[in-house]
Amino acid sequence: MLDGPLFSEGPDSPRELQDEESGSCLWVQKSKLLVIEVKTISCHYSRRAPSRQPMDFQASHWARGFQNRTCGPRPGSPQPPPRRPWASRVLQEATNWRAGPLAEVRAREQEKRKAASQEREAKETERKRRKAGGARRSPPGRPRPEPRNAPRVAQLAGLPAPLRPERLAPVGRAPRPSAQPQSDPGSAWAGPWGGRRPGPPSYEAHLLLRGSAGTAPRRRWDRPPPYVAPPSYEGPHRTLGTKRGPGNSQVPTSSAPAATPARTDGGRTKKRLDPRIYRDVLGAWGLRQGQGLLGGSPGCGAARARPEPGKGVVEKSLGLAAADLNSGSDSHPQAKATGSAGTEIAPAGSATAAPCAPHPAPRSRHHLKGSREGKEGEQIWFPKCWIPSPKKQPPRHSQTLPRPWAPGGTGWRESLGLGEGAGPETLEGWKATRRAHTLPRSSQGLSRGEGVFVIDATCVVIRSQYVPTPRTQQVQLLPSGVTRVVGDSPSQSKPGKEEGEGATVFPSPCQKRLSSSRLLHQPGGGRGGEAEGGRPGDSTLEERTFRILGLPAPEVNLRDAPTQPGSPEHQALGPAASGAQGRAEGSEVAVVQRRAGRGWARTPGPYAGALREAVSRIRRHTAPDSDTDEAEELSVHSGSSDGSDTEAPGASWRNERTLPEVGNSSPEEDGKTAELSDSVGEILDVISQTEEVLFGVRDIRGTQQGNRKRQ
């Protein structure tokens, strides 16, 4: 399609042609496409054309050329054509990895940079002229193009034409490196982005455009495009908006050209995305200096990223990065140029100068240094940037972890330039540049060794503690309701309890809770069971409850309050229903005794379940994944409870418990977790012991029931 030689000639041939023929005759002779291209350059783009941009890039180019002819110049439209070409060109470049002569590309890139500003100015002038001259002089526009081209030619010496042709060329022909477009991109960026483009391109487009436009050297066509990492989580996201603004936009534009030198110096190393991309789209990723990613010099310095990938470069880039920081932040072109020049502005100057967030600045600094040095050793640069340094460069796939610039990160010191012997002073300067708060806390002190600073937040360990196996205690229920961890003798006195006694037992919160849980869960449990249960819990359990569960007596009472209605009389009735429903209290005592055995047999299930539930709740409160305990508890309750009747009370009891317990225990639980584990073990032991004692003392029936329930 395009005449390869013509385009390949680069800025020179188009430039010459433009100069000689004012871009018309010679071009026509050589190629209609070329002619069209010239016209495109000269002619203003109609708004339609930009809309077409997204369409076929090649078609859009050709159509664009024609459109340019057709469409009169628009005030702002001239720039869009380059823009569109950029998009198409960039996209194509992104897809076509062509090997292009690096030297040529670099030369072009430099030309581009120079021409970019000139062309920008020319374009602005042209645009203004057009606006003033008339809405659309598409035909006149052609002559217009001459003047326009002429200034460009004078300024760029073929930059505009070559750029346009090159845009076309990439479309038509992959071989051409993006150098020219990139050079234009600088101008195009300045122009299209600065003035012509109403809005920023999509993220992808921007990456592509910026990468190709801003980074001729970036394209190693023989290699696949570098991995562009997602924004870093580590970087300061606040930097996004900091530098942004007209100034910033301008900076990106200028920086693209200026940055180009760094890139050029660095070789393809530097892919300079529009700084806006770094701040807006990439966010902190723009800051990711160390990676030679597409946008490798994110944020403030174009040079930085690639240099960082190259270890040596990275180290070198520290100083350059400082310069780059300045340039990237304030005036990328100038500062960058300075930095590239080898001015090691970085440590202090860049910190001061860099409008960029502190992070970008330091990184920029590294990179700038790298860029500058990259110039010195371009060959090294490319490979380093493009080829991950075995040591320094973190794997591309894990971009987030080994941030070269991250203090704790693998390449941090290298990035700083420490790796290459950058003195601590450099590091200090760098650190000074960076706000302390931006440094990862752990990394604030430099770690001398290589390594990756990894924060794994996948799981949070609330507490890890050793829980000893519960110690078995013999709990005997005494008629007095006093729990003694003693022999078996008192256990028999339990049956002697009376309803009154059971009521008395209730007063102790633990007893109440225990008895209520027992009663609730066991209609047959009877007051006797309750009283008995209460007694065991009387002193020890009560204490433990307060101490372990952190349940104040009032809370326990609250729990029991609902339970009690069913517990003393109701439960008594329940047991009575079991066999002594209408009996008098005296008779009930007997029932209680009998049931006490049964209740105890049974109680262990609910009682144990209640305790377990409480424990599990506490544990769940601290560790969300211990839900299984509750499920178990529920099953235990249902299994142990005699009837749905019991279950319902159990449920209510459980709920009540939960409310107060969760509320009260959580504060205390946290502090008492260690104690709790022991206490829980103790409680469970007590329960088991109590069950054993009770079972041994109780009826065979009760024992059987207890066994059943425990099973």
UniProtKB/Swiss-Prot annotation:
Known tissue expression: Specifically expressed in brain and kidney. Expressed in kidney glomerular capillary loops (at protein level).
Stretches for region Nuclear localization: 113-131
One of the protein's GO biological processes: positive regulation of transcription by RNA polymerase II
Coiled-coil zones: 102-134
UniProt-annotated stretches for the region Interaction with ACTN1: 341-436
Cell location: Cell projection, Dendritic spine membrane; Cytoplasm; Endoplasmic reticulum membrane; Perikaryon
Biased composition (Basic and acidic residues): 105-127, 529-546
Ranges annotated as biased composition (Low complexity): 150-161, 252-262, 346-356
Biased amino acid composition, Pro residues: 75-84
Quaternary state and interactors: Forms a ternary complex with MAGI2 and SH3KBP1; recruits DDN to the cytoplasm. Interacts with MAGI1. Interacts with ACTN1 and may interact with WWC1. Interacts with the podocyte slit diaphragm proteins CD2AP, NPHS1 and NPHS2; the interaction with CD2AP and NPHS1 is direct.
Protein function: Promotes apoptosis of kidney glomerular podocytes. Podocytes are highly specialized cells essential to the ultrafiltration of blood, resulting in the extraction of urine and the retention of protein.
Protein name (database record): Dendrin
UniProt source species: Homo sapiens
Lineage: Eukaryota, Metazoa, Chordata, Craniata, Vertebrata
